[in-house]
């Protein structure tokens, strides 16, 4: 019999706030984190906007010497993980470190580090490359650094499934606890790829919005959408086996109820046009949660603001929920924080938890004219206040990776 898994801690570094409190205040107020790019000179680029993390000072959130040996994606993960761990109230003096794991995904890792050192290699020769380039840039170092900083000696892995990385990480952590491999797991996603090659690459792929207006560049499910806005940051949760959490008197935010993961086997960047792959992930998550489609109160969609994703994801929701797809409330957090890539799914699970807690579904800002081809019940224009017992979070990644996670209101 699978063990029950609950959420006891949360942490976030995002374009609208560098703590859970700041982030959620921004979400509730409909704040946008999209602004002109400042990380580099983008004057010659077609894309001028990004959702950058602001006012983040690594040495204020972690050991200064350790921070110097981390790229931003690792720093964001460590900061968010420390917040989540403290929020959970875990005391390592009372815990078996081999029963606490770390599963943190990143879709890209240290792209900027690779970029800068390649430039050094070309201009100044191989002797000038940073000797720490490899451990700085490889994507598993977010999990590695969190494990080191918190002293966690259980299973430690990095899930890389593009923009589904954070969601898969939480799902895999859920499984590890359900089947007894761990009692606690620090899980989520992180990303920091707002750099020249990152923006140029996504632009060449025609994935990014070229809209110069920060207020309307990210407008998921809008008929005039033209691409996503690249974002960055980290979202981390502490997952815990229910009896372990109860035994130490932990505050329980919500329960992990379902996890579905599928592959489209269709295209390297586009979701399956009929939505069957993502739809099946939702069906699998509902099956594990033991619920019917009409019991899903809220869907936090992948909702990237690209033509293909929003249309095909809407089809996937219809595929999975049938008639219930017409009434379930759907939104996209990416309208506020842009597409945080490997961190997106984890941050959006946090939104689901906070939405259950506050009985509040944020609006999808920037979206004004719903695409009739998408045509579902998107929260646009104003937030929705309603009791939420089951919230679903969808994540889709290049390569055909589909993940659906269901979070439920905790009850004994």
What are these regions (language model features)?
Residues 124-130, 171, 175, 191-247, ...:
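Glycine-/small-residue-rich "gating" segment that lines the acyl/pantetheine channel
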Residues 77-90, 139-143, 147-191, 229-250, ...:
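Active-site-proximal alpha-helical scaffold in enzymes
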Residues 7, 23, 28-161, 190-199, ...:
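Conserved beta-ketoacyl condensing-enzyme motif
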Residues 4-8, 35, 213-289, 298, ...:
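Condensing-enzyme catalytic core mediating Claisen C-C bond formation in acyl metabolism
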Residues 84-96, 245-249, 282-298, 320-324:
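Phosphate/pyrophosphate-binding loops at sites that engage ATP/ADP/AMP, CoA/4′-phosphopantetheine
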Residues 181-226, 259-273, 303-310, 327-377:
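Acyl-CoA/ACP chain-elongation machinery
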Residues 1-66, 243-255, 350-364, 408-412:
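ACP-dependent fatty acid/polyketide chain-elongation machinery
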């Amino acid at each position: 019999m699978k063990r029950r898994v609950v959420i006891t801690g949360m942490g976030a570094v995002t374009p609208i706030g560098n703590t859970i409190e700041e982030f959620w205040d921004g979400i509730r107020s409909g704040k946008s984190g999209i602004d002109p790019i400042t990380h580099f000179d983008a004057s010659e680029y077609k894309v001028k906007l990004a959702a950058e993390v602001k006012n983040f000072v690594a040495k204020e959130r972690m050991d200064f010497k350790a921070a110097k040996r981390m790229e931003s994606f690792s720093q964001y993960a460590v900061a968010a993980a420390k917040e989540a761990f403290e929020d959970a109230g875990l005391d390592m003096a009372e815990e078996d470190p081999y029963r606490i794991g770390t599963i943190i995904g990143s879709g890209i890792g240290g792209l900027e580090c690779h970029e800068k050192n390649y430039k050094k290699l070309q201009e100044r020769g191989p002797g000038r490359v940073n000797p720490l380039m490899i451990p700085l840039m490889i994507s598993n170092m977010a999990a590695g650094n969190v494990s080191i900083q918190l002293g966690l000696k259980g299973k430690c892995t990095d899930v890389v499934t593009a923009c589904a990385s954070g969601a898969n990480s939480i799902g895999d952590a859920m499984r590890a606890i359900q089947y007894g491999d761990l009692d606690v797991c620090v899980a989520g996603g992180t990303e920091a790829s707002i750099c020249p090659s990152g923006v140029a690459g996504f632009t060449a792929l025609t994935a990014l919005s070229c809209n110069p207006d920060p207020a309307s560049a990210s407008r998921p499910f809008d008929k005039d959408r033209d691409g996503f806005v690249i974002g960055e940051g980290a979202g981390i949760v502490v997952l815990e086996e229910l009896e372990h959490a109860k035994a130490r008197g932990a505050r329980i935010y919500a329960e992990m109820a379902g996890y579905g993961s599928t592959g489209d086997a269709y295209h390297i960047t586009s979701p399956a046009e009929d939505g069957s792959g993502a739809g099946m992930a939702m069906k699998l998550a509902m099956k594990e949660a033991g619920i019917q489609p009409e019991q899903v109160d809220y869907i936090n969609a992948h909702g990237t603001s690209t033509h293909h994703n929003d249309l095909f994801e809407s089809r996937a929701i219809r595929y999975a929920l049938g008639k219930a797809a017409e009434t379930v409330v759907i939104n996209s957090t990416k309208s506020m924080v842009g597409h945080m890539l490997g961190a997106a799914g984890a941050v959006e699970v946090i939104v689901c938890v906070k939405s259950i807690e506050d009985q509040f579904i944020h609006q999808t800002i920037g979206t004004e004219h719903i695409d009739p081809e998408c045509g579902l019940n998107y929260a646009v224009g104003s937030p929705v206040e309603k009791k939420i017992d089951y919230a679903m979070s969808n994540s889709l990644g290049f390569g055909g990776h589909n993940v659906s996670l269901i979070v439920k209101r905790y009850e004994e």
